Every structure is written in structure tokens, then in C-alpha cells.
Amino acid sequence: MKEFLHYKTVRNNALKLAYRMYKEGFIPDVIYVSLRGGAYMGNVISEFYKAVLKGTSHKPVFYAAVVARSYTDIKSHESVAVDGWTYSPENLRPGDKVLFVDDIYDSGYTINFLVNYIMSKGPKREDIKVAVHDYKVQEYLDKNLNITPDYWCRKHIIKAQCDEIWIHYMSHELIGLTDEELEKYYFNDDPELREVFSVIRW
């Protein structure tokens, strides 16, 4: 199954999620967005904290990013490669509150690696929160991962591989679109996009 998720839906859900975190008393010192997927939602959450803390004595929430990806090596082991941090975890101190933001928790390998890496620099697990728009619980897989999202907008229970869903985030994804999907989700709203998409090699 494939779902097209409009950016307005992600924006509104991100605002509600940020409000929930704030009402529960969680104000991060640092927000790390996972590029690319976490950027849009992270921007919204960052803006919420900037607005809600304006005029208070609370220090601003620092906004940063990490580029990381999971892959399967030649021995079929899941590995994670980190291409860079805009704010080095070496600067974190015990007691710092950290928020990781991503669009989806799917395999979970990348976020597990990143959270464990941050904990190796001092912050404790209770001071690190993971927020995602979509949290996929793949019951048919035996992953045995310790780090799962603390906050999410939607939770999907996937009991079998045939039940898997492909979520297309319209805020930043273009690859994998059929002619029918382009027509329905892009050209119907703005016919000028036909020319834009004509130079894209699928």
C-alpha cells in the first residue's frame, strides 16, 4: 500500500506533537534533525519552541542536523554510516536534553546508532527523546532494538510483510512516482509542473 502524505498534514501534526512535548515539560537544549527526512518536521518543531520561549528567561533551543544512513554490508549485517554533524556531539554535556527528529521510524537501525553514540558522549537515555511522524512497529521482524520513539504522530502496527506501507512524504520526495500519481497529486493542482517534471529522469 502507498500513501501520499501532504506537507500540511506533517506540519500540523508536528505542531501538535511539539505542543505535547512542551506540555509534558520537555524542552530540548539541542534538536538534531536527521537529513533529509527529519528536516521539514524538525523545522516546524524548532519554530514552535522558538515562539513559545520568546520573552522568557529560557535559553534558545539549538538547532542542528546529522547526515546518517543505514545499509547492509556484504555479510548482511545492518550498519550505519554518519557523514557529518552540524553540531558535534563532543560539545554535549551530561544533563543536556537532546531531541532527535525524523520523518519515519522504519528499520530503526540509524536512530539506535545515533542515540547510543550520543549517550557515549555523556547525556543519559532519559534526557534523549526521539520524535517521528510515523512509527512503524514491524511485528514480523525480530530486530531486538533498544531505542524506539518516545513521541510520534502516527503508529502503524505491521503484522506481516504483505501489510507494509510505503509513505510518500510530499514535502521532500519525488522518486518512485508513476504517471498516474504525478497527474493526481501534482499536475492536477498545478499544470505548470508538467514542464518542471519533464527534465527529471525516472
What is the predicted function of each stretch?
Residues A65, F100, V130-V132:
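Structural beta-sheet core signal
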